[in-house]
Amino acid sequence: MNRTLPLILTAALLLTACASAAPAQPNAAATYPSAAASSPQQQSAASPLTPKFPVGHLLTLPQNQNGSPVWNTGDALYELRDASSMTPEALLLKTDYAALTQSVYCGIPGCTHDSDACPAYLASDFCVGVMAVDGTVYTYPGELTNVAPTQIYRIDPATGKTPVAAVPDALPHHMQLQWCDEYALYGCPLAASHQPGTLYRWDWQNDTVQTIPMLADEKIIACEGSRFLTIRIEANEPFPNFGSTEQEKAILAHAVYVYAWLDPATGAREKICTRPYADGYFHNYYDGRIYYTGNFRNADTPGQQASLLYFDTADGTEKTLLDGIPLDTYGIDVCVPFSPAFAGVPQRYLRVQTAGDAYADCLLDMETGDVLPAPAVTAEGVRRPALLLACTAAGQWLTAANPRDSYDPQYSLYALWDPADFLADGQPAAWVTMYAAE
């Protein structure tokens, strides 16, 4: 489910941004015909469509830095943790922000957490996710495969696991469930190249499935409120059914990306803007801005450069956040906010990670373009950067640090920070007492 894309920054850029005393300001706005917002005349004049089902607050189903499923309620973090590196067994853990403790999500006295009698025990965590709805925790099949569970289970720490919904036959095999709201889970399997697709809505609480048609080459890349943000390729001529690579390249040379809002309840789309197909690498949507890489120069040379741009939906202009980024030096992934997306609350910082160094973490300020290094903490006598993981309802940041010499996804130490101290290279406000298997 990881859909990250690379953005490249140099060491000099990092040093300049991190040492800057005053935040850098974005470059002046520029408007391009290909980046213009849709005018009212371009929108459909048809009567409003009737919603076919309720849509709540859409979220991308979150993962942590290791690709493991997590869920942040603002008061606690729920996650699946491998019980052993030798077996597929896993445990559902809860990190309580107020109590500063991580524990197995089980309240049965004397439970050894090693069988299905334990509410938190999973014989296998392959293709399993965790979510919380209305204060209740569930596990669900993250991808519909032969090794995935066939049920959604309600987890009661006092009594055990209860199956509440079976995977319906109407959902296609191997589809990933990537988004959710208060009512349903959503998935959109990959369609054949240049062919229409289908978005599936599984209302697991009422045992129904709805389908929403997707346009050719259309993909969901983000969500806000009750709408999905989509991107699709639009060309001046149809793609041949069995065209050669050269034919396709010739068509794509004059194609554009179309960004639009999709209302899943009605199927209606609202066009936002278009960008040249050559400008790719969508990175994030934040505060009415679509961030992507563009303005490629010196293509296919060691000196190739690009810019980090954003389209501002508030005024219909494209702006440059970072310019002159050499593409052969530093790789930084800025596709998603540090997971699990602050329980759905937007933040101005992106978690970024330098290529080739699992411990080098930074933040990108999406308002100023500053790149800030993660502060280092001493955990068990070892200095490691504090990797951002979640945000609490009280506004503190939860971080993870791994003091092991070799990267061990089963082992991390959590801490809570005041954001100002984190950004000032300070120290955490408190450490979390982690669960340790007996």
Report the location of each language-model feature.
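Positively charged n-region of N-terminal signal peptides that target proteins for export
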Residues: M1-L9
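C-terminal motif of bacterial Sec signal peptides marking the signal peptidase cleavage site
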Residues: L15-A17
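Bacterial signal peptide processing site
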Residues: A19-A22
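N-terminal low-complexity, Pro/Thr/Ser-rich intrinsically disordered segments
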Residues: A30-S68, N72
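PLP-dependent class I/II
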Residues: Y32, L91-L92, W397
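Surface-exposed loop/turn elements that mediate protein-protein interactions on large endomembrane-trafficking
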Residues: A45-L61, T87-S115, V147-V167, A192-M214, ...
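Repeated scaffold domains used in trafficking and secretory/extracellular systems
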Residues: T60-T73, D114-M131, L171-E182, M214-S226, ...
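Short beta-strand elements that form the blades of beta-propeller/WD-repeat-like
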Residues: S68-M86, C127-T145, Q178-A192, G225-A250, ...
